[in-house]
Amino acid sequence: MSSSSNSDPSSSPDNTDFIPLKDNPKDTSSYINKKNPFVNDSFDSHDDSYLDNVNPFEYNVADDEDTISMTSDGVEFHNLGITETVDEQDKILSELQLAYPTVSRYSETLDKGLLNGDKTTKGDYTSLRRFRKPFLFDKLSPYFTHFFSEIYAAVLRVVGPPRANETPGRNLPFSPILRQIYNHPLYNIFIFVVIVLHAVLLMIRSDDPHDKSQTIDYLIIVIGILYTLEMLLKIYLFGFLYDGSSSFYDFINSYTKKTPRTMSYLRHSWNRVDFVAIVALWISVIGKKQQGIFRLFSMIACLRLTRLLNITRKTETILKSLKESSTPLVQVVSFNAFFGVMIAILGVQFFKASLNRQCVWLGDYGDQYLPTGQFCGGHWENGIKRAYLDKNGFPSNVNPRGFICAEKSVCRVVENPYSNTVSFDNFFNSLELIFVIMSSNGFTDIMYDIMDAEYFVSCLLFIISAYFLTLWLMSLVIAVVTSSFIDLQHSGKNQKEQKSVDKHLIRNKLCEKYLFYSNFIWISFIVAQFVTLCTQTYDQTSSTANRYLIFYACVDFLLAAEVILRFFAYLPDYRLFFRRYTNLVDIVLAVLNLVTLLPSIRKNPVAFGWLSIFAIARIYRCILLIPYTRKIAKLLFSNFKQLLNLMLFLVIVLFIASLCAVRLFQDLPNDGDSDDDAISFATTYESFLYMYQILTSENWTDVMFAIQARLAHLHLSWIPGAFFTLWFLFSNNVVLSMFIAVIQVNFAPSESDLKMEQLKMYLARLLRNYNPFQASLTLNALIKRNGSRKGKTVDESHYEWLYEDNIIKGFLRVTNIPPKEPLKPSLDTSPELSKYSLAKLSNNFKRFVMRDDPFSQAYFKRVIGIRWEKDMNLKTAAKDMQAAKAFVRIKQTEFLKNHPKYNDVFWVIKPSNRIRRFCQRLVMPGVNERYGGVEPYQWVYRVIQVFIYACILTAVIIECIATPIYERDHLLNDKQHAWFVWTEVAFATIFTIEAAIKIIADGFCITPNAYLRSTWNCIDFFVLVTLWINLYAVLTSHALLSRAFRAFKALRVLRLINLTQTSQRMFHDALISGFFKIFSAAVVSATLLIPFALWAKNVFGGLLYSCNDDNVLSASQCVLEYASTPNNWEVWAPRVWSNPPDYDFDRFPHALLALFEIASIEGWVDIMRSVMDITGFNNQPQTNASSGNAMFFVLFNLVSMIYILTLFIAIIISNYAERTGSAFFTAEQRAWLELRRKIKSMRPSKRPAIRPLGLRGLCYDFAVQKHGIWRRTFTGLYIVHLLFLLTIFYPCPIAYTYVRNSIFLILSICYTINICVKVYGLSFYYFFHSFWNMFDVVVTLGSLTCNIAILAKFENRSLTLLQTTLLVLVTVHLIPKFDNFDQLSKTVVASLPSIFSLIATWIVLYITFAIAFNQIFGLTKLGLNGGPNKNFRSIRNALVLLFTMTFGEGWNDVMHDYTISYPNCVNGDDFYNSDCGNKPWAYGLFIAWNIISMYIFVNMFITVVFDNFSYIHTKSSSFTNLQRNDFRQFKDSWAPFDPMVTGYIPKRNAVKFVLSLRGVYDFRIYRDEHTLRSIISKVQSKTGQQSVPMLENPLMGSEINLEALDQIIDTIDVNVVKERRNVLNSLCTEIMTLPGNVISFSNILMLVVLHKIVDHREAFPISDYIRRAYVLSELEKSIRMEKLLGLVETSIIRKTFLQHMEEKKKALENPFILLSEVSEILPETPIQEVLRQHNADPEQLLMSTRTPSVSDRSFSIVESTVPTIASGEGDDNHSVEDHLKVPTDNEPRRSPSLKEVLLRGSHSLHSNNDRTSFDIEAGFGTAESDFQFGGATEDINRIADRIDDYLDRDSFKG
């Protein structure tokens, strides 16, 4: 060992691998070769695997000999005296294998792992060892070691998260000593304690800011000093920005290159956070205390506490997932912000000065000035509408609009709301309100205020912004976080070891039976106790309460005894009893329920109510008893630990955010508004509640606006706006999205089963196509019914391909398939049930009551389902489905023979009846194929269908016009001639005739094609009945009957869904296919709601009563009258002791309704504030008297968000993904679908193929260069343009407005010059081929015209709005300038078809519910939450109000307004004379709309966006490295072959085009160095070089170096060349088999990608894979056939040539023929003919290539219009039906025999026009032919293989 080894390690310049224990203590990942999957190689990557097993205890020399274990790489490890064979069930023992390199206590052998880091001395080695074997705790129990090791691991995670590839720091004086202090465990623990103490002190100071503030401030200063010393220590040891371990040049390059990072202080992300916090702390201490801007620095100082988020491994993992998703998250947020900025600019121009106008009450004599808060646009003055008054009291010069103030009041300009902080007067205020819209909570009040101040149409900006920004773009944020977290979950899930499931079997069968059957008895006791608790009320008598108590005690003792009996049933294996979690839970519940029976608790209503949760919790046994709820519940709780960790992460984040909010907003001055004064951040607890309220988004704008108003006088209102906005964005959109990801993972199949699930789903779709009971109901499908039925013929060859072993094995990538592989997918993850199960009993009951009806769809499903469950496998599926179909037909025939009247309508009208046959000629059967009837006349049927749909549409329009108010006004004037009544009679008659025709044609309910067998017919029939009932009620003036049935007429609108197939499919996916799953989720949600509702009733029942006079203290004082002052007007009113009007917990139904409203994240804040004021029974509430009660609603709200809202979202996402098939796609398949989408959307570049010359060439360069100076200049101009748009504000000086418009005019001229340059460079033809160019022309010329007109004093409001709109549209040009924006925009556009179909379906439901609400509540009195536009009195108002309720905006308050009843309303005898509400209809309609729209369709919107974004987000693919430059290179290669940019090139040029491709698309057989020209240039002999063998070539005129030629040929890889040649042959063959004589751009790009880049075995879904496999197989056969024909042609030519030579020889030997006459006599040889053609016209040879005509049958992947058997519902988005197909022939054909092929081979050189159909079929005919590939094809393949071998051998001979 060298002498230098004894020196200090810090002095060695090569000690770059030393990792100090502070920031990376003993990182052993490099020794054991375990790479952390979460490590990111980016700037701040970490590796914290060592933290899983940390032992901070010192080694005791007096300890006994320890055991040494060796790893695979020879590193020694202590195992702490624990044996290596650990029980799999004991996780703690397995985690105690602490992996830290040490040496044996008696061994002098050094650790090789540390020696690799140049630690060459024993002293250096031992000085670095800090983690050694404990002595005392390990002797007591290994659990102590694990416990304290976990604590220290948490300390290290908080204090100093490790970093990878760090250097040891700088070598300065005292560095070794300071480094030892820095690395000592006590130092880490001390810093951890300081951080925790800092948090505690901040919390204490917040709770009591006045008494203890000075002392705590001093302690915080001390903590700041400690933080500073820690920071200085790190800077001294490792440097601030640069540690000196490398050159400064390397340091600079480390920011841009992948080089090992230094350990300098600011190179670590957490250190940067610490640095900012410490600097802010000292600024806040030095600055003026808690005043002004220094509040912000006090808040920033709290960021040091964010290190507590690393306290557990899981929370640290959550942080890492956020860090991994930070880049796409920033991109998505920036993309959303861009559109938010655009709409904010429009908001400024549209609505500036709109919120500063209010109605001001002047009084009877005009001597008062009282702003009413009602926004307005004018006022009434002597019966005339007047415009509003400005701030000086002068009339404005605009027309009155919006809400018109009543007489004795004026509409006048006042201050904007919330101290002038809420408005659209400038960009920043407008942007804040736009973000409020994006938050989907709190924006509807602003929308209605704007509608009152402006026009009704103003709501369109809010509606469009809400759908586009909130549902569309903000869903991308959810998709980013969810996708990243799901990827992390899957990676962690793959690392987990599979646990063996222990089946806890009871040996005694008698005991097993006892446990099963007695379980129903005990559960009946639980249900009885639960129902009894529901019926108990707070105001019961003492005797009743005693009876209840006796019953509870009996049940509690019985259930406690049941637990004991259950324990004895497990004997003698009593350990099995404790292994079941349910037994442990029942023990705890039994003990706690017995404790609640103690007298001290029983006599305390509050304690008894809170502890009743333990009796309620027993209901979980009922949930687990029901199979469906048990499945969902187990799926939900299967990842329960991850949910708990997320909750812990959320609580820590909430705590830190609460402390930050207190530092910012504590003790703010009041602005005099009493409502704002109620919002206070005085304590940490209150701050916690408000921050949690913002997290849930419930009225979060009230908090933000109130705090902004208090800081307005300091001009710091931007601080709460930014703080609360960022907190909302992070907590609501990011953190809550993680819960969606956790739950969604539980519903996702495992990675290993994805392809098998695809195969099962594919076969299920085949089954649906075989189903004879499938019927299409869309108008489009009905009109084309005849043609579509012909297309349903199933191609048997399709099934042959599907069920061949090699195809299935190739897709599944397996070598063996189980012969009985079950096909039906199952979501049941629960263990197998015993034979004594409730499911078995229910199945027996179903079989007993079920009747067989072979004409029902359920019967077919049941028949095939029996085969599906038992016998069907991958190889016999097609035959089984055919057998099932035939079996059903046989059963139908037998059934009709046994029941001859079954097909008779009403048992009278037989199928042969003329009237019935006439009706059958008019309509199609609703379901099934018509049995024993006739088909309708197509043209008659089409006319009738169009007429019926026209009647439906007309009826809907009339319903929208004839509202109840319109009917009432019309009937008052002319009751006898109510046109809407008679039109309703006419439509009812038409629909009745339609129903009668359908019933006569196919029967009513029990015939094979009965009318009521169709779901839509059932709806129509129900609507028809209710329509006649309503007409009867109207004509007979029966008010109650009319109101009860008026709403049902709206159901007729649902028929409009059938206008398009996409909307019908979307309706089916949203409401029908997923109904059962959604219903199951609703049931599971109810199991959460019901226990919490019962608990809330027990706790808060009877405690919410209050007196309307705040001055009384109890119910006894709430009598007589008092002086009430509503709106500062004194009125005498009686005192009333009552509950809040909209909620209470006195009865169980009331509590259930209140919690259901809370579960929708609406109204829970008001309820929480009410229970916080409880003072006791019959006592007046006081503010925050029982503030702890708020935690009940915080807990329920959090649980409901996680287990109700996120459960619905996860289930809807899962159901939609399963319906479309995307749930089973692998990463490669998702990447392929995204690539396919890109290819389909690509078009050739719109530019000339040849660059022009001169000035036009320069303009051409400006137009086409993507990164040139011209493009960058205009990108800068667009940015400047956007910045000037941000400067629009109110009030704006006229001079600045003129300057700004002048600048916009100059910019518009620049844009016009840009257009002229592009037009001149590209020409008009190419310029106007681009959409962006046409858009540019329209927007630029429009903005130029508007700017000129405005500067020319032609200004008016409409022109200004148009100008602003066009100027905003100009900024859209920035999207294609940035790659991230361009990619995200394409993602948004990709989801357009699904979004439009969803919106179309949604609009139909909007109209349906709008008509229903209008018909029921069109005359109802307005409540407190109503307004001039916020009501159901017209359809347009109803639609807008339904829109607000879709986002949950106060839907529950509006619902309670419409439950108003007498005596608070007029309840007249006639419907038109009553303004009361209707409770049943209100609860039914509002809750139905809430579930359908807010829960289902909103989440469907998110699901569609998420489904499209998941393709973009996929990164794990072998071909995702295709960049935009690769596609641009392809376009550049295409341009010379398509100079007119038609998108097509002739097939004769296709091969030349393919060979011209370079880069990733290179198809050349030989590379550049192996081309003929390159080889010739290398082997040509130079003058004078004759030392090697030469060969003189007379054609080339030079000599060839044979040795050099041999060396070059030896470098050619024969296998690679052969593979390239095969790929090229396959591509060219497939191109030539396409129909037509041209090929499109997208088609050839698709073929190039498929042959060159994509591996279809990995990337294709099942339907695409099968088609592609078929195509490749046929291509291979075609190529082999060509080779065989070529061999035959060669033989024929050779034979002809020999005959020619023989004749020539004979002619030469003939003495009578001269030699010069031989060539004239003999005919031209075939070889000479080919050579002559080649020499005369080189292109002729390419043109003579066989190109099938348009009529030829193609099997290629492109331009397919033939419907495939796999096409079905949900398959349009995720299969390549339009790109891949299997041949399907309408009529059978016979393929030629091998003999015929060989005989016709001699004529293959003839022109393509001479080819017959047999020629084409020789290569491609397969369907229903006599040509069996099993025999003849083997001969062909054998011959072709021999030709292949011959050619390969001869090609490289010599």
Curated annotation (Swiss-Prot):
GO terms under cellular component: voltage-gated calcium channel complex
Gene Ontology BP annotations: calcium ion import across plasma membrane
Main location: membrane
Keywords: Calcium, Calcium channel, Calcium transport, Cell membrane, Glycoprotein, Ion channel, Ion transport, Membrane, Transmembrane, Transmembrane helix, Transport, Voltage-gated channel
Glycan-bearing residues: N40, N310, N699, N786, N1058, N1184, N1356, N1508, N1773
Any matching Pfam family: Ion_trans
Subcellular location: Cell membrane
Membrane disposition: Multi-pass membrane protein
Biased composition (Low complexity): 1-15
Gene Ontology molecular functions: stretch-activated, monoatomic cation-selective, calcium channel activity; voltage-gated calcium channel activity
Record region (Disordered): 1-33, 1764-1792
Biased composition (Basic and acidic residues): 1771-1790
Transmembrane segments: 184-204, 220-240, 274-294, 328-348, 427-447, 461-481, 514-534, 549-569, 581-601, 606-626, 642-662, 723-743, 946-966, 980-1000, 1021-1041, 1075-1095, 1148-1168, 1193-1213, 1274-1294, 1302-1322, 1331-1351, 1358-1378, 1393-1413, 1486-1506
Role played: Voltage-gated, high-affinity calcium channel that functions together with yam8 to mediate calcium entry into cells. Required during conditions of environmental stress.
Oligomer status and interactors: Interacts with yam8 to form a Ca(2+) influx channel.
Family: Belongs to the calcium channel alpha-1 subunit (TC 1.A.1.11) family.
Name of this chain's protein: Calcium-channel protein cch1
Organism listed in the record: Schizosaccharomyces pombe (strain 972 / ATCC 24843)
This protein's encoding gene: cch1
